[in-house]
Amino acid sequence: VIRTAMALLARGGSIYMVLAVCLAVPSHAAPVAWKEDMVCGKDLNRPDHQPGLAQRYVVTPNGAIAYYSFGQGSPIVLVTGYRATISNWNAYFLGELAKHHQVIVLDNRGIGGSVSETTRYGMADLARDTLTLIWTLKLRDVTLVGWSMGGMVAQTLLMQHPDRIRDAVLMNTAPPGHGGDAVPADVMRILSGSPGTTFGQVMSVLFPPNAEKQAEQCFARDMFKPADYGSVRVPAQVAQSQDALLGEWAADKQAFRRLRGIKVPTLVLSAQNDAVLAPANAAALNKAIPRSSLVEASDAGHAMMYQYPRALAQRIIKFIDTSL
């Protein structure tokens, strides 16, 4: 990068040309070490305890999409992962974001109050649902955050409809095609809720070994659980549909090549001890997306927002504040 920049200057190039070269190159620093911060429900100042917080809906051609909105500032839209509900977000992570931004979390189609009129759909359909929510709410300067499968939805939206997105955060996710590493088969069996799967097994794939015990005690207490949300289960048909679209995503080589067309500033977040989607996936995304930066958290697992809710949120806020 330095050689290219110096060559441009030597040939009479402007400082703006040099900056363009530097900004277009993915960046990656050494892993960051955050202080463990599982709250375990002890702090009652959390967004899901706010009076008047209520589930709302937008109408899409496929049916209603349910969401919650709280906080003030430029909007952050968060898309969750495989077989996940709104409750799988960490309440304190969302609360930290909401100190500076409007936070919108939604359920993917077929989950909770979000409707699915069809049983077969692809990543583009989930991206279209998110886009419809953004359009309907007339959001501007949106930061799009996708976790795990939600990061794949976010990539799809960025490739197809980037005009409403100011910047993006891809957290513990994977690129399409063969650009990264697949979820290990034994891990997928646990995440898919195979018969006999225990809560402890789920925690063992979401957290590194030294955090498992505390996660078993704190995970449910730190979940985002508004009073009107209730106990939401993921229907078997939705799980099967998501299995199918994940398979299609992994086979889509054309989409991987289209990642280079993403022009918005993108923060790629990775967990060093992610047993679900290995850090190689984040490295591949960082290499493929021109205006991306990579932050890897040491001693962190797939659900690292539960280990470091405030530090992770603050890193995202810093990215939003400094992105062009």
Residue locations for each model-derived region?
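Conserved alpha/beta-hydrolase "acid-adjacent" motif
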Residues: 275-281
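Short beta-strand/loop motif that positions the catalytic acidic residue
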Residues: 262, 268-270
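Hydrophobic, aromatic-rich cap/lid helix
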Residues: 230-255
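Catalytic active-site module of serine/aspartate enzymes centered on a nucleophile-bearing elbow/loop
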Residues: 292-324
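Active-site loop/oxyanion-hole signature of alpha/beta-hydrolase fold enzymes
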Residues: 110-145
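Conserved HGGG/HGGXW glycine-rich cap/lid loop of the alpha/beta-hydrolase fold
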Residues: 63-113
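Flexible "cap/lid" loop of the alpha/beta hydrolase fold
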Residues: 168-197
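Conserved hydrolase catalytic core segment
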Residues: 140-179
